[in-house]
């Protein structure tokens, strides 16, 4: 999922767009078009080191695919899963109202920051770009974090404000 695609469905690109963006995937797909990487591959990936994964990406000419300096809440665990990505651009009241109207039209509930969470399934990893915003932007706390974990059994990668760290560690 790529967030803020206003022309398609509020904050979700269409199945057709997602398939067009991932033409090399020949395996099974979720109903929304996302590639459904087999659980057996996800299990094997838990054994791959960061250096091994990075070497494969470099050899396939995937450049600029690594960003370090993340805060790790559970350093003894390995985070592997199917990525569901969202981008939240800095807020503008005029655009926010329009996107909210799309949510009403699409019968979405709650606020915009919960919409991508509604798409999550077991073994997903929620990957969010909030541009590092710590003021006036969505945050992940223990309520949303627990909702994400209940749906996925997994953690998150989040470039934005995190609160309730102790609740998230539990």
Functional labels for PLM-detected ranges:
Residues 1, 23-27, 115-118:
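Short hydrophobic/aromatic-rich motifs at helix boundaries and adjacent loops
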Residues 1-11:
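Bacterial Sec-dependent N-terminal signal peptides
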Residues 3, 34, 145:
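Short, flexible, solvent-exposed loop/turn segments with mixed acidic/basic and small polar residues
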Residues 10-11, 15-17, 22-24, 43, ...:
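Mixed-charge, polar/low-complexity N-terminal
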Residues 11-60:
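N-terminal pre-domain segments of enzymes
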Residues 50, 57-170:
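Feature captures the catalytic cores and cofactor-binding loops of soluble hydro-lyases/lyases
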């Amino acid at each position: 999922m790529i967030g803020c695609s206003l022309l398609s469905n509020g904050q979700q690109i269409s199945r057709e767009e997602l398939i067009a963006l991932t033409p090399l995937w020949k395996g099974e797909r979720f109903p929304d078009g996302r590639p459904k990487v087999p659980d057996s591959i996800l299990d094997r990936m838990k054994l791959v080191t960061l250096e091994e994964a990075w070497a494969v990406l470099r050899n396939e000419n995937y450049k600029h695919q690594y960003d370090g300096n993340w805060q790790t809440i559970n350093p003894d665990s390995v985070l592997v899963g199917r990525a569901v990505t969202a981008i939240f651009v800095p807020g503008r009241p005029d655009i926010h109202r329009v996107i909210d109207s799309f949510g009403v039209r699409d019968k979405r509930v709650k606020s915009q920051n919960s919409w991508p969470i509604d798409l999550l399934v077991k073994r997903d990893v929620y990957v969010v770009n909030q541009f590092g915003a710590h003021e006036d932007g969505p945050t992940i706390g223990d309520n949303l974090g627990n909702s994400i974990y209940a749906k996925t059994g997994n953690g998150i990668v989040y470039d934005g404000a995190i609160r309730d760290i102790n609740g998230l560690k539990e």
